[in-house]
Amino acid sequence: MNGDEGAEKITRILVAVDASPLSFAALEAAAELAASLHAELLGLYIEDINLLRAADSPFAREVGHFSGSIRDLDSQRLQRQLRSQAKRVRRRLSQLAERSHIRWSFRVTRGAIDAELLSAASDVDLVILGRAGWSGKRQLGSTAQAVASSAPAPTLLHAPRTASKPAILVVYDGSQVAQRALTTAANLILGQEGFLSVAIIAADHEEARRLQIEAAIWLRSRDLQARYRWLFEVDEEIVKKLMSVEGECTL
């Protein structure tokens, strides 16, 4: 890593929202971040094409959220629900943008969630996702994993704050995307007296040691320190455990 990477500026932030409480929390955090960075906030609501296709199946059923009753999954009712959710998201984004005095836009797309997110991420500097949503934790876990590994911009996985100081976990493997994620994390944590943890992804101890030295030297040049963990195999469950131990946000 070199000093030029530290000059990267976040001017456009994409936040994907599905009207769940945790995604609204991510929206609020994104608005705060956009205000502090004088960045534009882009809200994205995705109508899941797989869910809509399932609703067209004669065998599709849904369980009432409160009553627990089982009924046919009606595609027309589902589309009305999706439109209603999108309106709620847009209204909340408008309120937050007005309160935070930030530029914003909102878009509704229909398609596969991973593909739509990756497409929207192609022209932004940071992507923010809530930790849960889009039909539950399992769906978000695979979505976040796909976006984080393939998106050209760093992806921040947000959860509601549990401490007074921000905590960010960076997954670092030395790649260009990982370097951008470390740069973004450093920019977010500077001046906030927060906590930074770096999960080193490596094939062996020698590579892990080299990557830790590389990251530590770069962070020290910005008067930052971090806590390090070495991982030699990574799956979704390991990342989830790290998130629960290390901090509220993961890059």
Question: How does the language model describe each region?
Answer:
Residues 1-3, 9, 21-23, 27-29, ...:
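Gly/Ser-rich helix-loop-strand patches that form or flank binding pockets
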Residues 2-72, 163-232, 249:
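Small/aliphatic-rich secondary-structure junction motif
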Residues 70-80:
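Short glycine/proline- and acidic residue-enriched helix-loop micro-motifs
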Residues 78-85, 89, 109:
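Active-site beta->alpha loop and helix N-cap motifs at the rims of alpha/beta catalytic domains
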Residues 97-105, 220-227:
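A short helix-to-beta-strand connector/capping loop
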Residues 104-107, 133-136, 174, 228-232:
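Short, flexible loop segments at the rims of nucleotide/cofactor-binding pockets, characterized by
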Residues 108-115, 231-237:
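Charged docking surfaces used in two-component/phosphorelay signaling
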